[in-house]
């Protein structure tokens, strides 16, 4: 990191600082966020906010053209394939180094399973609730798995922000779980919630496997493999399960294109963030996706937003603010003491 380089600790002999005040360079060091805080901010702005548009846009494409989740997954995977050109230009193998190629493919498979579960859930469950269950389960599973497998714990304030954010998610999704309809519709809705939970579990496992990959081009390699594995698994099923469906109007094509671009941006930002910060904290910051999805659900879709949704969204926003703010304040305090 730039702030720890010896050059930044040398006194400036050409422009001496006044004896009564601290050097301006020390002030710059004091205010410079660490890699972990940068990762959390990237996850918040580049990962959570764009991902919040994906659920509503997917629902709009489904309502306009009856576009199933399998076709939407294939369209998204197509946006990952051009990354092969970047890998070729850099001279890197498309599938990664031979010794860790299996882990990279397994990570890509987990990503595809998470995406497929999310797209299936959003077609039978309100978009905000589907995002809530997926992000909540990914956060809890990431915290438990990282603690058990990597022995990497969290501070008290991190736990406070994480658990408070999960409380907000429970406030959002709780009333809907208690009022499931009886009969076939209720079964489909319950299965949608189960798919969202499994998607969060697959996401947390994928993040842990991703953190174990150590080679220069691991981010573009996993992104390309996610598209390749998704296509290899989805295209055969497309002709077995049902007749292929294409978007029927400009709105559907626009939604599909926007979903592909936004998910690729979100994937890249989350992939960067999880190498800098604790996976559970990254997943907690990604709860901002839920707030964005609820706002778009209210303004763009014929789906009501209950008072509990608004209350839970406020709790989520307050708690995901605690995590990067506390990390940044700790860094500043530590640098002042130095």
Swiss-Prot record:
Residues 49-174, 272-325 form the EamA domain. It is a multi-pass membrane protein. It comes from the Eukaryota. It is found in: Membrane. One of its GO terms (cellular component) is membrane. InterPro entries: EamA_dom (IPR000620). The chain crosses the membrane at residues 37-57, 67-87, 105-125, 160-180, 190-210, 221-241, 250-270, 281-301, 310-330. SUPFAM superfamilies: Multidrug resistance efflux transporter EmrE (SSF103481). It holds the Pfam family EamA. Keywords: Membrane, Repeat, Transmembrane, Transmembrane helix. Its main location: membrane. Residues 1-28 are annotated as: Disordered. The gene encoding this protein appears to have arisen by SVA-mediated retrotransposition of the SLC35G6 gene in the primate lineage. Belongs to the SLC35G solute transporter family. This is Solute carrier family 35 member G5. It comes from Gorilla gorilla gorilla. The gene is SLC35G5.
